[in-house]
A protein has these predicted regions:
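Functional cores that coordinate and move charged inorganic groups
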Residues: 134-137, 145, 150-334, 338-344, ...
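Gly-rich Lys/Arg/Thr-decorated short loops/hinges at beta-loop-alpha junctions or inter-strand turns
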Residues: 45-56, 80, 105-114, 184, ...
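N-terminal small/polar loop signature for handling phosphorylated ligands or for N-terminal nucleophile
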Residues: 63-176, 181-187, 373, 377, ...
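Acidic, two-metal ion nucleic-acid-processing modules in DNA metabolism proteins
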Residues: 99, 104, 109-110, 263-327, ...
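Divalent metal-coordination and catalytic microenvironments
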Residues: 34, 87-89, 141, 167, ...
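Short glycine-cluster motifs
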Residues: 422-438
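Cofactor-/ligand-binding subdomain signature composed of acidic, glycine-rich
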Residues: 1-78, 324-362
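Flexible, glycine/threonine-enriched loop-and-boundary segments that flank and lead into catalytic domains
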Residues: 384-411
Length: 613
């Protein structure tokens, strides 16, 4: 295992921490965690701990929203056929399900379309546009894709089909000539929050349309409204709340920041999931051993913002969505057809949901077999082929690898070697297609921009991107990409880092501390589960290796008279002999609730272990 560099965060003002701790009546560590997340005043802390739907931004601040809603209303008035188009991953399919279900509720003649990963690839395809033309579609709402589809949108325009683009990926130099392009990452877009998911963009379209229809805004403060408008706003909240479960699934699965507006949307989305989940999500969760409470059925929502929860035996978190829901929904688009994922999220029939969930879970098991085999082969090549020795990047190609798993394989290679990685396989139209995954220190999208002359298509984010190129350009691309990575690191090998929020003694882990810490949720990028360091620990003598090389131990401080805490250290079984010998160690960990057989206990999720000299 590659040695990690621990970085104790000190990027905060001590005076600000002390003032915040005093005003909130909390200890210094809690105040430090807040300041590290940009929460520096009592009012900011109130909004952080008590998210409200009035904290979302006015959707009409987004460039193009006014034009988008006008064109949608025109289509409704003229009874034109609308098609919702989306990417085949969780973000895209949840966005399609959200927008499609909203307009379907309005009794609109509407269709949806997801491109086939193998035949059409990522983004807006000519086949999809041809399908729209054949079925009489006049307006396409594209979600989680399209920001670079200039030629495809022009092709549709020639066929009398208008496009509304709703994307969150980085734009290129040229923006499609659509009726409206909704993407907060456009340089001239004044929308205050830039990190919405693709499904989040879809939600803002629905929010904007419903606000215009009802004559009240979600972001209006209730105390500033008269009684009639306040009642109308409560109705608006209830109408919109039912879509936020899909937004939460997309936020978790697409690994977007969970601060600002995303945190509000995820917070209420989780409330919906924990109160009255849609049949498809509940059916999928059964495969993660998350079951409905046996004693009592789901409580109904009392108000839009204060529902009674407790539908499942355990409270669903972002982590459950990341590991239990997202991979399964993704598997349909990776292995078979993402249409199944959309149908799963749309159906209100419990039996149909169960059948679809069965199929999707089978796809996921097949996906696991494929990505495990490809990952093992990729690692074997890296270890045995002299070409990879001393390289700062890893680019691998095998025409036999399944297109649906190359992104997962790239992620696993980054985890193992901590180097920017691109995994390629055979694509369509005689192209090589692949997925790039990066490390914290390297912007892979920026690097691909510097290789654009060698590429046919690329798009994505700082840490993940899709790319395709011609076979004859592969060698030149590999060498240029390697050079860019070397230049970025100054020729030094990147070292994985663990960012530590604070040092913590076990005696400081009080019920009040844990209660407040839990209120930091939902967790995710920019609001990660806090990482702590506790020093000078030993095991109580019951350490063992469980599962596939996971170290299970019970840690107790040498200097403190406190009870031990159970700890799990994934993929760290090689440390078992030293722990059993009674060697002292420092632990870098996250505090988490471990739910097992109806019981919940606090355990340490170990990020790294360092033995004392």
């Amino acid at each position: 295992m590659k040695e990690k560099h621990w970085i104790i965060r000190e990027d905060y003002d001590l005076e600000t921490v002390e003032k915040l701790a005093a005003s909130l009546g909390v200890d210094r560590i809690i105040a430090t965690l807040l300041v590290e997340r940009g929460v520096t005043t009592f009012e900011e802390a109130r909004r952080f701990f008590r998210p409200g739907l009035d904290q979302v931004h006015d959707p009409f601040l987004m460039k193009g929203m006014k034009e988008a809603i006008a064109r949608i209303n025109e289509a409704i008035e003229k009874q034109e056929r609308i098609m919702v188009y989306g990417d085949y991953d969780v973000d895209g399919t949840s966005a399609v399900a959200l927008v499609y279900s909203y307009f379907k509720d309005l009794d609109r003649t509407i269709d949806f379309y997801i491109p086939d990963r193998e035949r059409e690839g990522y983004g807006i395809s000519y086949q999809g546009i041809d399908y729209a033309k054949e079925t009489g579609v006049k307006l396409v709402i594209a979600l989680d894709c399209g920001i670079k589809a200039t030629e495809e949108v022009q092709y549709a325009k020639q066929s009398g089909i208008d496009f509304i683009i709703g994307d969150h990926h980085l734009p290129g130099d040229e923006v499609p000539q659509a009726v409206a392009v909704l993407d907060p990452k456009q340089a001239d877009c004044p929308y205050p929050y830039k990190e919405l998911s693709g499904c989040g963009i879809g939600f803002k379209i629905v929010e904007a349309h419903l606000e215009r229809k009802m004559g009240v805004r979600l972001c209006d403060l209730p105390e500033q409204l008269d009684e009639v408008r306040r009642a109308r706003q409560e109705e608006l909240k209830l109408k919109l709340l039912k879509y936020l479960d899909l937004v939460a699934v997309s936020i978790a699965s697409d690994i977007v920041p969970i601060m600002g507006e995303n945190r509000v949307l995820a917070f209420f989305g989780l409330r919906v999931l924990n109160t009255k989940p849609r049949p498809g999500i509940e059916a999928i969760l059964k495969y993660g051993h998350v079951d409905r409470r046996k004693a009592d059925a789901a409580d109904q929502t009392d108000t839009a913002e204060k529902p009674k929860t407790g539908y499942f035996e355990k409270e669903l978190t972002i982590t459950d969505l990341v590991f239990l829901v997202g991979p399964r929904i993704n598997a349909a688009g990776r292995i078979r057809s993402a249409f199944d994922s959309v149908r799963l999220m749309l159906t209100e029939d419990v039996n149909i949901a169960r059948h679809l969930a069965d199929d999707i879970n089978n796809y996921n098991m097949e996906r696991k077999e494929l990505d495990t085999a490809a990952t093992e082969e990729a690692k074997r090549r890296i270890e045995k082929d002299p070409f990879y020795r001393g390289r700062h990047s890893l680019v691998l190609y095998d025409p036999g690898w399944h297109r649906g798993v190359v992104g997962i394989v790239a992620s696993r290679i980054v985890e193992a070697y901590y180097k920017p990685t691109i995994v390629f396989t055979k694509g369509s139209d005689d192209l090589i297609t692949g997925s790039a995954r990066s490390i914290n220190e390297f912007d892979v999208h920026e690097a691909l921009e510097k290789c654009a002359d060698l590429l046919e298509h690329f798009g994505g984010h700082r840490c993940a991107a899709g790319v395709s190129l011609k076979q004859e350009n592969m060698k030149a691309f590999v060498e240029r990409f390697e050079r860019l990575v070397q230049e970025s690191s100054g020729g030094k090998e990147a070292v994985p880092e663990v960012e530590v929020d604070a040092e913590l003694g076990f005696s400081q882990i009080t019920p009040k501390f844990l209660r407040i810490l839990k209120q930091f949720a939902p967790f995710g990028p920019e609001n990660n589960v806090p990482v702590f360091v506790t020093r000078e620990l030993v095991d109580t003598g019951n350490a063992r290796v469980v599962g596939t090389n996971h170290l299970k131990l019970s840690a107790i401080p040498i200097a403190e008279r406190t009870a031990p805490y159970p700890a799990i250290a994934f993929q760290m079984g090689e440390y078992i002999s030293r722990v059993r010998k009674g060697e002292r160690f420092d632990l870098c960990y996250q505090l988490e609730e471990n739910y097992w057989r109806g019981k919940t206990e606090i355990q340490l999720n170990v990020k790294d272990i360092r033995f004392c000299e």
